[in-house]
């Protein structure tokens, strides 16, 4: 994958565009970004940290979401399913930083 030339607003626009399709196909109830991109501190080698909430967690669906967004954004996407059992440190970061669409 190439350098990330997308900024926070670009990525949020892509997520908004994909939200209804992901909800219908994969049961996504919420999604957003966190990490350096959400904080406005992303560099050209930064990945996209994506948080999703789903009706029924499904690893197969998460892989599809990841691959579709990597193709569209042309950069690496790390995806986290947000749930009660999410690592406490990661959950706190997401709670503080996440920008949902």
Please name every model-derived segment:
Residues 1-30, 38-44, 54-101:
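Catalytic core of pol beta-like nucleotidyltransferases
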Residues 33:
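Conserved histidines in hydrophobic membrane contexts and catalytic metal-binding motifs
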Residues 49-52:
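Short beta-strand->loop micro-motif that forms the acidic, two-metal-ion catalytic signature
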